[in-house]
């Protein structure tokens, strides 16, 4: 039959994840990073680092070292989520359940896009 076995699917997903690169993650998040003035990705001598700026204190308040593309993806997903929460609520209230669901879909879509790009590069 033409159906892919669960084992083959798991192996394929694992291979696609292994092909995830920092460049793919940065490409997928480029539009977001261009819009968010508070977070930057900096290439240090040790590797990529995601830095968050606190505009009220006028200082960097978060620094996440990302030794792997998966770490970079996780850090940027968190930064994106915080950015969107502020965009949606203005920082004045909690997200509604509907807004939380929408944000979860956006996160899933960004993750899926990274996986799709990684799969393209590995084939």
Which residues make up each language-model segment?
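Intrinsically disordered, low-complexity segments enriched in Ser/Pro/Gly/Ala and basic residues
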Residues: 4, 29, 44, 65, ...
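Acidic, low-complexity, intrinsically disordered interaction modules
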Residues: 42-104
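Negatively charged, low-complexity tracts enriched in Asp/Glu with abundant Ser/Thr
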Residues: 2-36, 121
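Charge-rich, solvent-exposed alpha-helical interaction surfaces
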Residues: 11, 15, 28, 32, ...
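Intrinsically disordered, low-complexity regions
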Residues: 3, 106-107, 113-121
